Amino acid sequence: MSDRFELYLTCPKGLESLLAEEAKGLGLDEVREHTSAIRGAADMETAYRLCVWSRLANRVLLVLKRFSMKNADDLYDGVHAVDWADHLAADGTLAVEFSGHGSGIDNTHFGALKVKDAIVDKLRNREGLRPSVEKIDPDVRVHLRLDRGEAILSLDLSGHSLHQRGYRLQQGAAPLKENLAAAVLIRAGWPRIAAEGGALADPMCGVGTFLVEAAMIAADIAPNLKRERWGFSAWLGHVPALWRKVHDEAQARAQAGLAKPPLWIRGYEADPRLIQPGRNNVERAGLGDWVKIYQGEVSTFEPRPDQNQKGLVISNPPYGERLGDEASLLYLYQNLGERLRQACMGWEAAVFTGAPQLGKRMGIRSHKQYAFWNGALPCKLLLFKVQPDQFVTGERREAQPEGTEARQQVPQASEPARLSEGAQMFANRLQKNLKQLGKWARREQIDCYRLYDADMPEYALAVDLYQDWVHVQEYAAPRSVDPDKAQARLLDALAAIPQALGISPQRVVLKRRERQSGTRQYERQATEGRFQEVNEGGVKLLVNLTDYLDTGLFLDHRPMRMRIQREAAGKRFLNLFCYTATATVHAAKGGARSTTSVDLSKTYLDWARRNLALNGYSERNRLEQSDVMAWLEGNRDSYDLIFIDPPTFSNSKRMEGVFDVQRDHVQLLDLAMARLAPGGVLYFSNNFRKFQLDEHLMARYVVEEISAQTLDPDFARNNRIHRAWRLQLR
């Protein structure tokens, strides 16, 4: 075999230039960058050195052959031409990985089989024995990449991906791969800071990946020094003496690095469940003297190195994937910025984020940004110098002390945001509305009400108070509105709400209200299962602000529910499309003789059952899971008081066809009126803004529109929120 080889090193997308620089420093020549990879030339010693020392590569591939191919036969022939007896024992084990397509190979599994067959046939014809396939831990792992008609056949020297250092056996919900963490540290300037004796702190350290990688860089520890099994361990071209030389050198450097006084490297994590796994990872890496992990909130983050030295604050905040996370993340970033300005003057900071727009809310200018990919997610690394001339004042933020409570998941900001002019106007409007509506709500003993409903066109939000929680719904912006401007106004509003209302940011829940199709409006959006009890008209109701688009309580129908309570005494009450049966609870409170509630959703009927039980009602209250139209066609009972509040549009696997309130309301009302007892009343309401009641109904029944009577002061600004009618038999 030649003394020089072509090597192909793979890496996460975005790390190519960093890997090229690192590989050159380790001896790779003629380096060229490709997408998610680099290639170059080196001897065997350098190949070993790259395996043990590369902090950034995924794999080190030794190229055996390049050949052109037009079809599957060319693939077989090209692989078969290699003298495989130089690489693999005839009775050994192998695994084959195939990537790319073209030249008649459109299935990677088929391509891998052709490569395997060529290797097996070559060895069997020569030795009379054949190797077997072992996917997990083979003697030799062969890789073939097909790129625009050229096949690149390689041996994988690394074995398992090099990002698997062996110390992180326990990880959190959103782990950062070790080589990506190392790349972020390098871009953030940690090698320079460490060489100067600086400190490092991570205020949201998870299980400590940044901390361990930082300590290995500072202590000159090869990232894969402890790896025992390599892709070259059973390769017949392996040179053990040369490998021992490279490994012994790395071992000596690690011992020398660990003999130095350790740098101050600390991590803080709010989730107590991650503390011990993080500490276990540190111990497995042999860095217990260098790295310490403590439980701590971002709101109390204050690094205090032993020698008062400055250093690097590095963090990978949560990205936010659940409904309502955006508000929490905004406050988290604001709080992180505040702690940096208050407790880390003179430090450098690096924030790795999948939501770079939130970095603008930290109150510090980012002097440099780098693009990365975390898997398929585009991310940015924001670099900061924590010094006064980089602080953003005026329209964004300015430090002002304010005592506030600490929070478990998204800490309360220790100082308020300096609001933009528009956000301050929004805050002023909230306070004005609170003053006016608050008096009414207290007088009426109402816990939950709408405080703001797109009063200012540029802030297209609905803001509802649920006791000391705020439920914010963002209306989808028209296509003519610049998405970046809409996002900026949303973030401004979210910054203003806690200040204007004097509440903890943790108690702000954000959702986006868009045009819903089918049953999407009823689908579960998260799984927190957090229910809270609220009061309305003497009844107790359960709401859930996080898990669904709606909360379980339609605030605009409050007057209708109160009307039902007043009129229900001694009546047989029927609630169709009952949702969580809040109107049924009011009817029971008002003394209804019996209640029947019908809905297709088991989830909401379970919720309804809990609402009834919460108020002590059970035996005389029937809950029916059924398609309302089908149920009405099969029911023959009579009712004195009926309430119908259907969705605008609905479909389900459990129902026949699709319900459309405009198209189907005549049939619905005719079926329901057939169940109305003489002298009874039916209330019909819906939220379809373009709805028109069929005029033929007015000829058949006594119909009175009562929409204006069903709006409380909190919805008086939006008299199109719903329409309602009172129907009786003629």
Swiss-Prot record:
Q: What is its EC number?
A: 2.1.1.173, 2.1.1.264
Which Pfam families would you find in this protein's record?
Methyltrans_SAM, RlmL_1st, THUMP, UPF0020
InterPro entries, sorted: 23SrRNA_methyltr_KL, DNA_methylase_N6_adenine_CS, RlmKL-like_Mtase, RlmL_1st, SAM-dep_methyl-trfase, SAM-dependent_MTases_sf, THUMP_dom
Q: Write down the chemical reaction(s) this protein catalyses.
A: guanosine(2445) in 23S rRNA + S-adenosyl-L-methionine = N(2)-methylguanosine(2445) in 23S rRNA + S-adenosyl-L-homocysteine + H(+); guanosine(2069) in 23S rRNA + S-adenosyl-L-methionine = N(2)-methylguanosine(2069) in 23S rRNA + S-adenosyl-L-homocysteine + H(+)
What SUPFAM superfamilies has UniProt attached to this entry?
A: S-adenosyl-L-methionine-dependent methyltransferases
Q: Where is this region: Disordered?
A: 394-418
Where does it localize?
Cytoplasm
One cellular-component annotation, GO: cytoplasm
SS bonds (residue pairs): none
Note the SMART domains from the entry.
THUMP
The record's GO molecular-function terms, alphabetically, read: 23S rRNA (guanine(2445)-N(2))-methyltransferase activity; RNA binding; rRNA (guanine-N7-)-methyltransferase activity
Domain THUMP residues, every copy: 46-157
Q: Does the keyword rRNA processing apply?
A: yes
Assigned keywords, A-Z: Cytoplasm, Methyltransferase, RNA-binding, rRNA processing, S-adenosyl-L-methionine, Transferase
Q: What is its main location?
A: cytoplasm
Q: Which HAMAP family match?
A: 23SrRNA_methyltr_KL (MF_01858)
Similarity comment: family membership: Belongs to the methyltransferase superfamily. RlmKL family.
Q: What does this protein do?
A: Specifically methylates the guanine in position 2445 (m2G2445) and the guanine in position 2069 (m7G2069) of 23S rRNA.
Please identify the protein, giving its name as recorded.
Ribosomal RNA large subunit methyltransferase K/L
Native source organism of the sequence? Pseudomonas putida (strain ATCC 700007 / DSM 6899 / JCM 31910 / BCRC 17059 / LMG 24140 / F1)
Q: What is the lineage of its organism?
A: Bacteria, Pseudomonadati, Pseudomonadota, Gammaproteobacteria, Pseudomonadales
